[in-house]
UniProtKB/Swiss-Prot annotation:
Any GO MF annotation of the entry: proton channel activity
Task performed by this protein: Proton-selective ion channel open at neutral pH. Actives at neutral and alkaline extracellular pH, likely participates in some alkali-related physiological activities.
Location (main, coarse): membrane
Gene Ontology biological process terms in this record: proton transmembrane transport
Protein name: Proton channel OTOP2
Membrane association type: Multi-pass membrane protein
Primary gene name: Otop2
Location of the region described as Disordered in the Swiss-Prot/TrEMBL record: 1-20
Compartment annotation: Cell membrane
GO CC annotation: plasma membrane
Keywords of this entry: Cell membrane, Hydrogen ion transport, Ion channel, Ion transport, Membrane, Transmembrane, Transmembrane helix, Transport
Reactions the enzyme catalyzes: H(+)(in) = H(+)(out)
Tissues of expression: Expressed at higher level in stomach, testis and olfactory bulb.
């Protein structure tokens, strides 16, 4: 083993285990992962325990832990920006694939919405601050500071390959990642309990309630509780921050993915030509497309918004209206999922005629994208298979059951074919990677050294070639760079497919993220599995399905740019 650590004197490039720093690389990663796992498990224990009345863990305990974690993470970020990143040769390389502009732009957008949510949350708890714990008012303020500091940090440092304070940086990145995941889980649990509370209010189920004030958690009656949100402004603040939870959830997940890529890049050595092949050129939206994909995608987006609003209005009304709302909701989703499946399949077929080379270079960002796409899809797979079993085994053969079954089957097919299309697209080289064949019938294609008068006499050449004269003293000899770039039909089709799938994934993210829960409005699964089991399945799996949609949007935007 010791002989393997000694580099041969004639070797120009040492192996990965030659340097003692590289030997400790895995140990430093293991230490940071263990730190993140333990912190995250502690946070998950408190968050899950605070969601139920029968567990003696209060929401103030959860807020105190999250506030402490955000303060520590913000302090480390400040140390990184002021000390670590300013060391000599601290960042010798920058990963061109990490932190693309659309990912950082999405992070800023979701961060702004999170700041608005923190303002609403502060106003909500300040409406009855006399009987509230100070930590409830302090928590959204600290979260706003943390969001600002972290967003600035990721905007300027997402591409860093840091080579200073390696172990401290790894631990700091993993701790910050664990903090974001804890915030994500707290938001998901709070939103899920809020949805369960709405369901129990109309069906008499009391196994779940919202995170209540401490006096009520301690056993006080609701009528005697002075900490009630009774004013109009308090109701606005309460409803406002619940509707902004989806943006907070996506912000935490976006930040977590960028932090993981930074963690993978700590101490990474890059070649001087890294990223040159995949640097996207300046593009404009809808350029070099057939417009069919954007138009059809926008049409489905607008129709989906109308269906979502109609569903939310009717599902809270009479029972007959709920059934009608479910039929409309499932019908739209079946049409949308069916079109997305066919379009994804056609994109994979188009790649069979694509001559671009496959990109097999090491790329932590792409590896993470593929893993997240495959992993997040498992949540929707689980819900779909549970629905299929409930419909086939236990439900009567009616229209609602048929729509539910078709929706579940198409959901599985759509996720599968879309993942295949996106993953294959991410592994394709840029358009310039196509092998260029120079047929003998077109001698003027490419770069030709020739006499200018002879070039003008060729009938098959373009009328206005671009000439570059390397030496003014010999004007008769020149370099004629005659480029005839044309956008192939398959490239246009791929751009249309990417935009269509992007818009469809946005509307399919909006519906469940902002409260559409046909899983509970449709009583097939609730009657078959029971409310407690079905609620656990949906509340665990649905957040991954929601994250899948937004992550697919990010990946499809990259596919569009690189097409």
């Amino acid at each position: 083993m010791s002989e393997e650590l000694v580099p041969h004197p004639n070797e120009s490039l040492p192996g990965p285990r030659a340097s003692p720093r590289e030997v400790w690389k895995k140990g430093g990663r293991l230490l940071s992962v263990l730190l993140a796992v333990n912190v995250l498990l502690l946070a998950c224990t408190l968050i899950s325990g605070g969601a139920f009345n029968k567990v003696a863990v209060y929401d103030t305990d959860v807020f105190a832990l999250l506030t402490t974690m955000m303060l520590l993470a913000a302090l480390w970020i400040v140390f990184y920006l002021l000390r670590t990143a300013r060391c000599p040769d601290a960042v010798p390389y920058r990963d061109a694939h990490a932190g693309p502009i659309w990912l950082r732009g999405g992070l800023v957008l979701f961060g702004i919405c999170t700041l608005v949510m923190d303002v609403f949350k502060t106003g909500y708890y300040s409406s009855f601050f006399e009987c509230q714990s100070a930590i409830k008012i302090l928590h959204p303020i600290i979260q706003a500071v943390f969001v600002i500091v972290q967003t600035y940090f990721l905007w300027i440092s997402a591409k860093d390959c840091i080579h200073t304070h390696l172990d401290l940086t790894r631990c700091g990145l993993m701790f910050t990642l664990a903090t974001n995941l804890a915030i994500w889980m707290a938001a998901v649990v709070d939103e899920s309990v809020h949805q369960a509370h709405s369901y129990s209010g109309s069906h008499g189920n009391t196994s779940h309630t919202r995170l209540n004030p401490d006096s009520k958690r301690a056993g006080g009656a609701a009528e005697e509780d002075p900490c009630l949100c009774s004013t109009a402004i308090c109701q606005i603040f309460q409803q406002g921050y619940f509707y902004l939870y989806p943006f907070n959830i996506e912000y935490s997940l976006f930040a977590s993915t960028m932090l993981y890529v930074m963690w993978k890049n700590v101490g990474r050595l890059l070649a001087s030509t890294h990223g040159h092949g995949h640097t996207p050129s300046r593009v404009s939206l809808f350029r070099e497309t057939f417009f069919a994909g954007p138009v059809l995608g926008l049409l489905l987006f607008v129709v989906g918004l109308a269906v979502f609003i109609l569903y939310e209005v009717q599902v809270s009304g009479e029972r007959g209206h709920t059934r009608q709302a479910l039929v409309i909701y499932y019908s739209f989703n079946i049409v949308c999922l069916g079109l997305m499946t066919l379009v994804s399949l056609s994109g994979s077929v188009i790649y069979r005629f694509d001559r671009r080379a496959m990109d097999h270079h090491k790329n932590p960002t792409r590896t993470l994208d593929v893993a997240l796409l495959m992993g997040a899809a498992l949540g929707q797979y689980a819900i779909s298979y549970y629905s299929i079993v409930a419909v086939v085994v236990g439900s009567p053969r009616d229209l609602q059951g048929a729509l539910n079954l078709s929706h579940a089957l198409l959901m599985i097919a759509q996720h599968t074919f879309q993942n295949v299309f996106i993953i294959e697209s991410l592994h394709r080289g840029p358009p310039g990677a196509e092998p260029r064949e120079m047929p003998p019938k077109e001698p003027c294609q490419g770069i030709t050294f020739a006499n200018l008068d002879a070039i003008r006499t060729l009938p098959s050449c373009p009328p206005t070639p671009r000439l570059v004269i390397p030496n003014l003293e010999s004007p008769q000899e020149a370099v004629a760079i005659i480029s005839a770039p044309r956008c192939h039909w398959r490239r246009r089709c791929l751009k249309d497919i990417s935009l269509f799938l992007l818009l469809c994934n946005v509307i399919l993210w909006i519906m469940p993220a902002f409260g559409a829960r046909p899983h509970f409005s449709n009583t097939v699964e609730v009657d078959f599995y029971g409310y407690s089991l079905w609620a656990a399945i949906v509340n665990i799996c649905l957040p991954f399905g929601i994250f899948y949609r937004m992550h697919a949007v990010s990946s499809l935007l990259e596919v569009y740019v690189l097409s």
